[in-house]
Design a protein with these regions (language model features):
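Conserved catalytic neighborhood of penicillin-recognizing serine enzymes
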Residues: 1
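Acidic/histidine-enriched alpha-helical segments
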Residues: 28, 97-112
Length: 112
């Protein structure tokens, strides 16, 4: 892989969380560790949209990478909040118990 291409991708992922126009900027603007990330959505049947976010931190020397996907979750910046909270716990930044801020709902459907 050409290093120039890799650098362009990495800078794009940094701008997602650090530039005011970034799709996850609102979620990471006050986060004390630099994060690279990418929001996304995937169309599903019946006009449903799955949301996802992939992030890694610290940007300069990553220790952790996380992907969160929520079925029928809409757009990816909501999943960025989940990644931010997990990273906050990992780096010892959150003061509240993570269970108070996050929940998981298991949804299953049988296709006929």
């Amino acid at each position: 892989l050409n290093q120039n291409y890799l650098n362009a991708v990495l800078q794009g992922m940094k701008s997602v969380t650090s530039d005011t126009g970034g799709t996850a900027y609102v979620r990471f603007k006050d986060f004390n560790i630099s994060v690279g990330g990418k929001t996304g959505s995937a169309e599903a049947p019946n006009n449903q949209v799955h949301a996802w976010f992939v992030g890694f931190a610290p940007f300069e020397n990553p220790e952790i990478a996380i992907v969160v996907m929520v079925e029928n979750g809409g757009h990816g910046n909501y999943t960025a909040e989940v990644v931010r909270d997990i990273m906050g716990e990992y780096f010892g930044m959150n003061t509240q118990d993570i269970e108070e801020n996050m929940g998981a709902m298991i949804y299953t459907e049988t296709l006929q």
